[in-house]
Amino acid sequence: YTCNKGLQGIIYSGNIVIDSILSNGLANLENRGINLKCSIIIPPSLNIADVDLCILFGNLIDNAVEACERIVEPGRKKFIVLNVNIKKDYLFIDIANSFTGEVKKQNNIYRTVKIDERYCGIGLFNIRKIVEKYNGEFSVSHSDNVFSVSVMLSLLWGKK
């Protein structure tokens, strides 16, 4: 299934859990000046727990949207590019977004750039835990104005 924004901004990929998370998390992007491009080619069901899909996609989307919203320079493009697909027995998720260019790293781990850090910065930690659970891989990178996260999860998890 391919990601298409239908009536009222609802995303249809064919997977109801992912559709719900993305439709909610990516609602009203146009009104916030954020351009969205996405391609989601997945089956209706995956061998990944729904709660893990919610945590994974929820954190990825929230981080991308919040990073775009921190851009305040007039005329600066705000965007999110999301690609989700399956190759062999793996789910691949790649998300890239514009951001201010400000990065905080401590012991080679990305930290939040939010002012109130008490309840922030656990999103990437939660993503890493899910990646470990599904014998996957996880990478984070950035250039001057683009922040990218790539996730690969095994769909053979729990199968004997």
Predicted regions: what they are:
Residues V65-R76:
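A short, flexible helix-to-loop-to-beta junction within the catalytic ATP-binding CA
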Residues T2, G14-N31:
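Short beta-to-alpha transition helix within the HATPase_c
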Residues G101, S143-S150, L156:
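Glycine-rich nucleotide-binding loop
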Residues D89-G121:
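Glycine-rich/acidic phosphate-handling loop/turn and adjacent ATP-lid/helix
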